[in-house]
Regions:
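Acidic, divalent-metal-binding catalytic cores of TOPRIM
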Residues: 2-311
Length: 311
């Protein structure tokens, strides 16, 4: 491409994102403390009209360009549970419910058919921000930038290759963490996606379990054995059309990088996972965002009260 998307700059952010590849065990929240901090913010004489609470830096980077920065400021909490708990308080607060909203990754909410019914809480249309933004148009631009040709199967191949590691993440969320056993949750710290996903084909379940168990999970009695995992997969079938609801965006970025490197080792090698993540955010257009349920939810909440959107 004549003008590389990587030449564009990105907005600064408030905190370091802790939603790294390895972050799965959610910490206890101090929602009341965060709400108190937000209340102090809006009492400042130079405060913005609307505060948008998000999980971390990547979410702010992805969303900021769509909003009127004169009217909106972002507040980063660190994880999705904090966003939800803060919004539970905000939605019943006579002052804050009119000027504060939270945006969280859906994670497995769509797969589990979970509706939070919290007025000020909005969720992504897909599993998370990256999967929502990785539209066919965005994939096309990434391919033209990195390998200088179109590769329409990029996204689906990457998601299919991740299916078994995605199932393990789903087991962690649906079985282990839902019991409230956060300390027993599976750690995905230090996972090399190349060890659990091979381009368009998933690594077999047994190999995924052995590899992840060796990454700090050897002594966890909650870690599933092969029979348990196979039964879980059988009982929770995921159609290919639902993979955008099922696939972790950080995993997806790594898998896309690996596929691009395999297609064009010379041309694509200079593009890292961070470069790919940046391209997803930059290439995702306002016109595509305006078609999402996330946009419509925010716009309905606003109800023309504030000049919320960037022109």
């Amino acid at each position: 491409m004549e003008n590389s998307v990587l030449q564009e700059s990105e907005p600064l952010s408030c905190v370091e994102d802790n939603k790294s590849l390895g972050n799965t065990v959610l910490e206890e929240t101090g929602a009341e403390i965060l709400v108190a901090q937000i209340r102090l913010n809006i009492q400042h004489p130079n405060h913005k009209e609307v505060i948008i609470v998000v999980e971390g830096e990547d979410d702010e980077k992805a969303l900021k360009k769509f909003f009127n920065v004169q009217a909106v400021e972002f507040y980063c909490t660190g994880n999705c549970l904090k966003v939800k708990n803060v919004m539970q308080i905000v939605s019943t607060d006579k002052q804050l419910k009119y000027c504060v909203i939270g945006i969280k990754d859906a994670d497995f909410d769509h797969i589990n058919k979970i509706s939070h019914n919290i007025a000020n809480l909005m969720i992504t249309d897909a599993h998370d921000m990256e999967t929502m933004m990785l539209t066919p148009n965005v994939c096309r631009k990434i391919c033209l930038e990195t390998i200088n040709k179109e590769y329409p199967k990029l996204s689906i191949e990457a998601m299919l290759s991740l299916k078994n590691i995605s199932y393990l993440r789903y087991y962690n969320d649906k079985i282990i963490l839902k019991r409230g056993s956060y300390k027993d949750g599976i750690s995905f710290q230090g996972i090399d996606i190349a060890q659990v996903a091979s381009n368009s084909q998933p690594i077999n379940v047994q190999s995924v379990l052995l590899y992840v168990k060796g990454k700090g999970n050897s002594n966890k009695t909650s870690f599933p054995d092969l029979n348990t995992m196979n039964l879980f997969i059988q009982q929770n079938p995921i159609d290919d059309g639902d993979l955008i609801l099922f696939t972790n965006g950080h995993d997806l970025v790594y898998a896309i990088r690996n596929i691009l490197h395999s297609i064009a080792p010379q041309e694509a090698r200079k593009y890292s996972d961070k470069n790919i993540a940046t391209m997803i955010r930059i290439c995702y257009a306002k016109e595509e965002f305006e078609k999402t349920d996330l946009y419509k939810s925010i716009d309905n909440w606003n109800n023309n009260r504030f000049k919320l959107w960037a022109v």
